[in-house]
Amino acid sequence: MVAVIIKGNEVAEKKRAQLKEEVVKLKEQGIVPGLAVILVGEDPASRSYVKGKEKGCEQVGIYSELIEFPETITEERLLAEIDRLNGDDRINGILVQLPLPKHIEEKAIIERISPEKDVDGFHPISVGRMMTGQDTFLPCTPHGIVELVKETNLDISGKHVVVIGRSNIVGKPVGQLFLNENATVTYCHSKTQNMKELTKLADILIVAVGRPKMVTADYIKEGAVVIDVGVNRLETGKLCGDVDFDNVLDVAGYITPVPKGVGPMTITMLLHNTVESAKRAGVVCK
């Protein structure tokens, strides 16, 4: 058995086409979804991510605004800019590109964003709503992962999901989203002693640890859905995931590649959240 490859880039394109249609309808009502992205400093990776977000906005018809600051900006000035954007009716979503310089407290910045414009889903209020199953903006990468699993037409309810990784960005929230879908969820991490025994029980295995090709075929239950969140650059310059793709291919039922797997879904779900925010606000732009 050779695994079916879940092509995240194709799923993302399909969802972006749907979003584009939604944006056209909103514009007919005088509503233009708007996303503001704040970039601090000159980090090449951050700039690359921001460029991808701008391109995504352009693709679906979302108004985007890039606000750039030098690395020397004070926390007070950055907070003031967020306050301004919170009060700007043209802006439905505010995203601060992380990481920030060490002298700025990320927690304070994230918590200053209005929960109604928290399209990253990082605000504690958004997290609390997600944990209790309330309607909220879901964090983009975890939301994208759930959507990719749904593409397999597997009924998630009652399935055993194992998550390797417990970060606040991916690991913890993705487990909660699967719990909200009535799955049974197990977390594995660096202190887990019997990891392979646990992962071999997984109907759905999510790997998000940042260790190149860590997960091999002996971690996988035959026919499992394997979602590889890791993006690692090898010495050769080639990108690879946390899963040894070629090694696992003959055991898994479904698997995401790296690149063109989870990555394209992250920005797509950000666009989705921005459009949803515009619908909720319902502000007609003049």
From Swiss-Prot:
Keywords: Amino-acid biosynthesis, Histidine biosynthesis, Hydrolase, Methionine biosynthesis, Multifunctional enzyme, NADP, One-carbon metabolism, Oxidoreductase, Purine biosynthesis. Belongs to the tetrahydrofolate dehydrogenase/cyclohydrolase family. Pathway: One-carbon metabolism; tetrahydrofolate interconversion. Pfam families: THF_DHG_CYH, THF_DHG_CYH_C. This is Bifunctional protein FolD. The keyword Iron does not apply. InterPro entries: Aminoacid_DH-like_N_sf, NAD(P)-bd_dom_sf, THF_DH/CycHdrlase, THF_DH/CycHdrlase_cat_dom, THF_DH/CycHdrlase_CS, THF_DH/CycHdrlase_NAD-bd_dom. One of its GO terms (cellular component) is cytosol. NADP(+) binds at G165, R166, S167, S190, V231. Homodimer. Its EC number is 1.5.1.5, 3.5.4.9. The keyword NADP applies. Gene3D superfamilies: Leucine Dehydrogenase, chain A, domain 1 (3.40.50.10860), NAD(P)-binding Rossmann-like Domain (3.40.50.720). It comes from Bacillus thuringiensis (strain Al Hakam). It catalyses: (6R)-5,10-methylene-5,6,7,8-tetrahydrofolate + NADP(+) = (6R)-5,10-methenyltetrahydrofolate + NADPH; (6R)-5,10-methenyltetrahydrofolate + H2O = (6R)-10-formyltetrahydrofolate + H(+). GO terms for molecular function: methenyltetrahydrofolate cyclohydrolase activity; methylenetetrahydrofolate dehydrogenase (NADP+) activity. GO terms for biological process: L-histidine biosynthetic process; methionine biosynthetic process; purine nucleotide biosynthetic process; tetrahydrofolate interconversion. Catalyzes the oxidation of 5,10-methylenetetrahydrofolate to 5,10-methenyltetrahydrofolate and then the hydrolysis of 5,10-methenyltetrahydrofolate to 10-formyltetrahydrofolate.
